[in-house]
Amino acid sequence: MGRRHGWADEFRTFFPTLWLILAPLILSPLLFFGQEGKCAFVILTMSCYWVAEVVPLAVTSFIPMIALPFLGIVSIKEVAPKYFADTNIVFFNSLMLSLAVEECQLHKRIALKMLTYVGTRPHWLMAGFMIITSFISLWISDTACCALMAPIAYALLEEIMIPKMRPEEKENEIEVMKIFDKEDPEEKEKKKLDTSRLSVRDRGICKCMMLLVAHASLIGGTGTINSTGPNLIFRDNIEKNFPNEDHGISYLSWMAFAIPPMIFYMFSSWFIVQLQFLGPRHLMGMFREPTETEKQEEEVAKRAVWKSYDQLGPMTWAEKSTLVIFVLAVLSWVSSDPKVIPGWSDLFRKGYVTDSCSGLVAVFLLFIWPKKKPDFRIFRKDKSRPSVRQEPLIDWDCVRRRFPWSIILLLGAGFAISDAVRVSGLSSLIACSLNSTISKMPFFVMQIILSIVVVVMTEFSTNSATASIFIPISFKMAEAVGAHPLYFSIPTAIGPSFSFMLPMATPANAIVYETKTIRMIDMVSCGVFLNIFCIAITAINMNTWAFWLFNMGTYPDYALRHATNMTGNSSQCF
């Protein structure tokens, strides 16, 4: 037995090194199948490394810069700019703004204030957390949003559940947000939430709360075009495929398309998760008068929320300043090119000023605007006191310590792969194969099949990687069968955000999984049904509201011009 244990130990120790060598060796035959095969080799090798996590994700993101030039697919001069392309700068701006929000604790104030309005009954508490989380996720990345909201949800669960887990401690007052404070490690261990010592119902509430935070952060990311990697990859692809064309996609038009189904995605998650862990009786209970026990629980939760909110004190200068800069940045994105009326970007030379420019102005302000009210002489009561220079809202030391550069590199790799898939002809080859299989089917059925493939794939790789592969394919498929360019590409951009099933599918899932309140099987069982609901909602939206909004019943002139320009350059299968 000891020997077998030793071999297992050895295997676990050396598996990363072994896989680093074996994965490219196994895939090496692809190198003999032209540019398409070489591109597939790079993508599959990266996917193997991503799934197994044999090296950090950020390091794996360097592979396109190494492999694509060496294999003669794309030159380094073309690959390198993808890592800090215009679209990636927009995402950089969003992350910097979210860092400023986190630094001044504005997100915490917004979350707790909204919770005071939605109530503390379990149904409405969960709904409230979903609404708050998805709202925040509209403006920042799903990973950052979940990282901000999961500790708040967990701390609230600790406040409500620990007294039930340890009846002898009921008389003790437990401060709500201890998770954020420095405290004695032994004391913290004593107060640690252990769901195995709770009733089935209370354990279910814990699972619901944490899963819904992860789901809401992913769902909220679908609502704006700048908030998540797949949406940005879609935006980058449509601008590359149809440069200087009025394709109808803007910050405002995307919100008009995406917000209505986002509400249905959230309701589906709220309904499925509670049905799974608490049962239909619990759901029906929202319409009856609460029992005395439930009233006591609600009172505990209400006190916890208000206590946390009161501890924040009055709104600080830093919070007000960050909120104003954040709102101005969002307004600049919404109004730059609203399509329905001329935007402010029309004041400048066409193509010179984009959303990244206005976002960088906001980021620049964060580094020069003071964290505290300026200490000007005219504001001081004591004129004899010397002036004090105030620190900015964020400084570079804060960025160096806390900025998630790995996400920027991961997204940059996604852009590089997406471009390589298009340039190498791999997108044409795969689209051709799919087209020969499903071309005789109605467009509606083709759209659903493509959505299912994307949603399944995104559970086993990062959402940016999935989007970077399938979005170029979706454009080629639309061109091949004569469908509107957005008809297949938009569901392909939305689908990677439906990675609800596995912890490794997205960092948001990993964050809530690490709280130990949920198991892998819990995620999978809920995720399967939620994926089905979300695919159905997307299909209905694409063939009703979005169909009208983007005028998909008519093949657009810009797509016709593009198809004409590409004649002779396309794959022979078309």
Swiss-Prot record:
GO MF, one example: citrate transmembrane transporter activity
Pfam families tied to this protein: Na_sulph_symp
Regions crossing the membrane: 14-34, 54-74, 124-144, 205-225, 253-273, 323-343, 350-370, 403-423, 441-461, 485-505, 520-540
Principal place of residence: membrane
InterPro entries documented for this protein: Na/sul_symport_CS, SLC13A/DASS
Keyword Coiled coil belongs to the record: no
PANTHER family: PROTEIN CBG18085, SOLUTE CARRIER FAMILY 13 MEMBER
Name this protein carries in UniProt: Uncharacterized transporter B0285.6
Organism, as annotated: Caenorhabditis elegans
